[in-house]
UniProtKB/Swiss-Prot annotation:
A Pfam family it matches: SecY
Taxonomic superkingdom: Eukaryota
Protein's name according to its UniProt entry: Preprotein translocase subunit SECY, chloroplastic
Organism: Oryza sativa subsp. japonica (Rice)
Region of interest (Disordered), residue spans: 1-59
Amino acid sequence: MAAMATPQQCWLPTRARAPPPPPPRAPSSASPVSGAPASLRFRGRRAASASASAARRRRGASLPCSPRCALETAGPGFDPLGLYNDGPSRNDTQSPLSNFFGVLSPVFGSSSGGRKEKSYGRGAAAAIEDSSIDIGDFFKGPLPGKFLKLLGYLALSRLGIYIPLGGVNRDAFAGNLDQNSLLGTLDSFSGGGIGRLGICSLGIVPFINAQIVFQLLAQLYPKLQDLQKKEGEAGRKKVLQYTRYASVGFAIVQAIGQVLFLRPYVNDFSTEWVLTSVTLLTLGSVFTTFIGERISDLKLGNGTSLLIFTSIISYLPASFGRTVAQAFQDGNYVGLLTIILSFLFLVLGIVYVQEAERKIPLNYASRYSSRSGGLQRSAYLPFKVNSSGVMPIIFSTSSLALPGTLARFTGLEFLKKAAISLNPGGALYIPTNVLLIAFFNYYYTFLQLDPDDLSEQLKRQGASIPLVRPGKSTAAFIKTVLSNISVLGSAFLAVLAAGPSVVEQITHLTAFRGFAGTSVLILVGCATDTARKVQAEIISQKYKNIEFYDVNRFDQ
C-alpha cells in the first residue's frame, strides 16, 4: 500500500506533484521538479529549497537561516506573492483580505529573487485611478491660459452688441420686437443684439445658414461629399473655406433685409446710411464668425454653440424679469409657478436624455481571456440618443427666419404671408418646425456617424458586433440602430420646440417666449460638452506623466 504523502510534499498541484524528498545524507542531489511538466520548471530552484527546508525540519536541525530561508520555512500556507494560486488552496482558513491580495498579486507582484515583473495591465489601471479630478488639476497645464483666451473672445463678441447703428428710433423698434415672436427668439440667440441694434446683431446666423446650404449641397453633388469625407482634414478645410465665403454672402443679404426692415424707424433713410449700415452689419457678422473659429481652436467646445450659449445667458435675466413683471401685473401667479416648474422639469429631462446612450457590445479577436476561456466583452460602441445636439434646432430656427428675411428684401406678398404663418403662434409654425427638426436631426446624425465608415474601422481594428457579420451586415445593423435613435431624438427635440407654445397657451404669459426649450437645450448641451472637454484635457495631461511599464512607481 502506497504511503500517504506528507503536507510538505503536497505544496505542488496534484496533477504535477513532485517526487518525495531525497534522503538526509544527500539533500542537494535531488530535483523536486524532475517529473513536472515544462510549465512548472521555472519553480525548480524554489522547490528544491523548500524540500531541503522540509528535510531539516523533520531532522530537527537548528541550522542558521537567512531571511529568505525563514520565509521558506514559514509553513505550507505561506504564499505572500500568490505564486501558487493556480493549484488547490493550501490554507482554507485564509481571510477575505488575503484572498483579495492573492488575486491582485499575479498582476502587481514580484517573482522570486526580488526582481520586478513588467506589468502590461498596470498602465491603464493607473490612468483610470489617477483620472479623479480636483481643483488643483485645473490649474496645471495649459487650461488656465485657454480659459483666459475663451473669456477674452467671448467678451469681444459681446462688445459688438453694445455698439449701435446710428439714426434709428430704438424705442419704437423695441415695441415692435416684443410683438414678433420669431424675432424675439433670434434676439435671444444674439444676446439682445437685434433689440439693441448692435453692429454684431446678425451674430453667427449667416455662418449657420451657409453650413446648412453646404450640407444640403453635399447630398446633391458627390464631388463635394467626397471632398468632405474622403480627402480627410485637407478636404474639410476646403469646405470650411467655401462656407466662410458663402457666409459673407448670407451676411450681406441678411444685412440688407434688416436695414430695409428698419426703414420705418430710421430718422433719415438715405443711400449713404444704407451702405454704411450694411457694411457694419456684414463686418460684425464676419468678426463674430472669426471669434467662433478661434474658440473652436481652443478645443473647449464648439465655437458656434458657445457664442449662442453666452448670448442666451446674457438674455436670460431680462427675459425672466419681463415674465415675472407680466405675471404680477396680471395677477397670474399660477401661470408663473407653472412656468417655473416646467423650466425645472425641462432641465431634468434634457440632462437625462443628453446623457442617455445605446451601448453596442464589441468583441476584439486580439483580446482573449484565458481565465474566462472566451472573448472579453468590456468594450462597447456608444451611440447618444441625441447625438446631433442642438444643431437641428438652430438649423430649423434659421430656416424659419429665411422667409421673413426674403419678404423684407423682395416685398413679395406670398412671402409675407408665409413669414406670418411660420411665426410662433402661426398655423404652420409647429408642424413645419417639427418636420424641419426631424429632417435635420436625421441628416446630421448620419453626417456625423457614417455606418459604412464605422463598419470599415471596426473591421480594421479586429472588432465585431456579436451575432453580426463584419462588413455590409455590420453597416446595415449600425444604420438601423442610428435610424431608431434618430426617431427618439427627433421626438425629444420636437417636444422641446413645441412645448413652450403649449405652456404659453396654458399660462397666457408671452414675455417668456424668447427663452424657450431650445435655449435650455443649448445651455445644457454646451455646459455638458465643455465640462467633458475640460475633463478630457485634464486626463490627457495625466496620461502624459504616466509611465505605463514603470512598476517601481506603484509597488511602493
